[in-house]
Amino acid sequence: GIPCGESCIFIPCITTVVGCSCSNKVCYDN
């Protein structure tokens, strides 16, 4: 639920390595 400051419209979230995931074209951490 916390935005990770990264979008995932064109490329996947790089922040997945720190627990973030793509949701509604924005990377979130829980």
Curated annotation (Swiss-Prot):
**Keyword set, alphabetical order:** Disulfide bond, Knottin, Plant defense
Pfam families referenced in this protein's UniProt entry, alphabetically: Cyclotide (PF03784)
PTM characteristics: This is a cyclic peptide.
Q: Which InterPro entries match?
A: Cyclotide, Cyclotide_sf
Q: Name one GO biological process term.
A: cytolysis in another organism
Q: Has the keyword DNA repair been applied to this entry?
A: no
Disulfide pairs here are C4-C20, C8-C22, C13-C27
- What is the superkingdom listed in this entry's lineage? Eukaryota
Q: Which PROSITE patterns match?
A: CYCLOTIDE
Q: Which SUPFAM superfamilies match?
A: Cyclotides
Numbered residues of crosslink Cyclopeptide (Gly-Asn)? G1-N30
State which tissues express it: Detected in seeds (at protein level).
Concerning its family, UniProt says: Belongs to the cyclotide family.
Tell what the record comments on domains: The presence of a 'disulfide through disulfide knot' structurally defines this protein as a knottin.
Q: What does the UniProt function comment say about this protein? A: Probably participates in a plant defense mechanism.
Q: Give the protein's recorded name.
A: Cyclotide hyen-K
Q: Origin organism of this chain? A: Pigea enneasperma
